[in-house]
Amino acid sequence: MIWLDAMEANEEGDRGAALAMAEEVVSLDEGHADAWFAIAQWTLPIDSRGKQMMPDMIQASKSMAAIRKTVELDPQNEHAWKIGGEIMVGHLGMLEHGLVWWEGRKDAAPSNVLPYFEQVSILIRLGYFEEAGEYLEVLDRMIESQPSKSLEARAGRLRGIYEEQASMERELGFEPQNSKDDSWDLISRMRKKKPITETYFLLMFVMPIVFLLGSAAMMVVPSTLVVMLLIIAMYFGIARFSRRLLLKLNRPESFLNRAIDVECSSGKVCVPDDIRVSKLYSYVIKKRTPSFQERLGVIEQSGEPLPMNWSLDVPEL
């Protein structure tokens, strides 16, 4: 009866009353999976005027605790696994725990490919490209056994990101736990500057080249239509081939993002103080969710240094 009242209160928009009743339900029946899942969702803030509201660290942590209980009682609740993965990685920055979380989903649903997508993304973010490649191979084999155009397209995009980032890493790698890594000097040199946006890069680099080539084409080709088609083709072609240059220019941002992810994953600090108070750091951290920033602030205050021998605990395939 209390559970029905809780659902009714939620439908009427009284989230606070609904949450209180759901909590009462689990206090009486700890095995009520639906009530635990409701607590996980109702703990999160409600969207306001079409704008997605982000949870703070306490809300995210409370929701995550309820999600853990949900999947323990109902391992087949795919929606709960997805929400848990998003909170753990996107809102709390616990990427290493995220790998373990998706291992749990594999145990519950061995044929589900979502865990592999998520784990590859985490490994790429943390710079573990060899392991990411191994997971991708398994993912490709799984998709071959259950053909799907959407999954194939998604896997293709993920592989493109992997190959692009892995290629960049082969040119210049970065291990945040190593305070003597040369890439820290690169980040430090660029700490007073913001990254170059793709729009700015296209306007200041790609468009002038296209304009010059287009002007030359107009002098040679009499047809306006042909010239327009050539300009469009040149624009997309140059934009595609110049993307690698943009990635190189923005390496400091990419490396700093990795260092921040390592800090949040390990619970220990590795970013030098001169970089932490820089314009680049402020730009990067503002893109993270409020709960991520809040948790990172707690880690910063603890001041416990990241050991040089730290390494990610990657689940075996």
Which residues make up each language-model segment?
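Transmembrane alpha-helical hairpins and terminal membrane-anchor modules
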Residues: K192-V262
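Canonical positions in the second alpha-helix
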Residues: E24-V25, K69-T70, G104-R105, V138-M142
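TPR/TPR-like (Sel1-like) alpha-helical repeat modules
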Residues: I58-A65, D107, S121-P147, G160, ...
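Short coil turns that delineate tetratricopeptide repeat
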Residues: E30, P75, P110, E144-P147
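TPR alpha-solenoid repeat register
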Residues: A35, A80, P115, S148-S150
